Amino acid sequence: MKPVKQSLLAAAVLAAFLVPAAPAFAQHAEHVVIAQTTATAKATETGAALRDLWVGHIFWVRNVVVETLAGNKKAAAAAEKEVVANAKQIAGAIQPYYGKEASEKLFGLLAGHYGAAKQYLEATAEGSKAKQDAAVKNLTGNATEIAKFLSGANPNLPFDTLNGLLLAHGGHHLLEIQQLRAKQYAEEAQTWEAMKKHMYVIADALAGAIAKQFPAKFS
């Protein structure tokens, strides 16, 4: 098993162990590699831009988590505004290929993703297992909806593969929240590194699939 696959599977298994209500994260974490295209300068540039946007997503969500757990409502609200702005940028990145309606659809789905993560954060801070379980269900369902949407738009993004990537990403959010809540800072630092690498996998998969679907735009 390749190192990337091992890290994703390990993160998902940890999330499932710490959150028994989320076995789906463990079941779908290991994924097959999406077929890659020969990189052109524009494809490389697009991939780098998507990496930056997806890392921005986890950066600002982490800030929301940190400030919420610290009780700093003003800072948490400021970070949340950045989460929303980042989601609009990620959604906007697909508009040149799929149109405004698709961009707006993706933004709504990304908003749902963040909403479920925030729901889990608040439930964890409150200590409510029932609310945690509800949040996990919402996060899992949202991952499936995003995978359906993107795989439907691009045949180079197999649903099962994309769903696994998104479920593993959700598992990272849960694990990070739990570790920060428990003040397990050294462990969370390792989770953060795994999250960044996973964002690269997702960004590269999206960029490669788009370049393959629209070769004329990348020639």
Language model features by range: what are they?
Residues 1-10:
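Bacterial N-terminal signal peptides that target proteins for export
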Residues 17-25:
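C-terminal segment of classical bacterial N-terminal signal peptides
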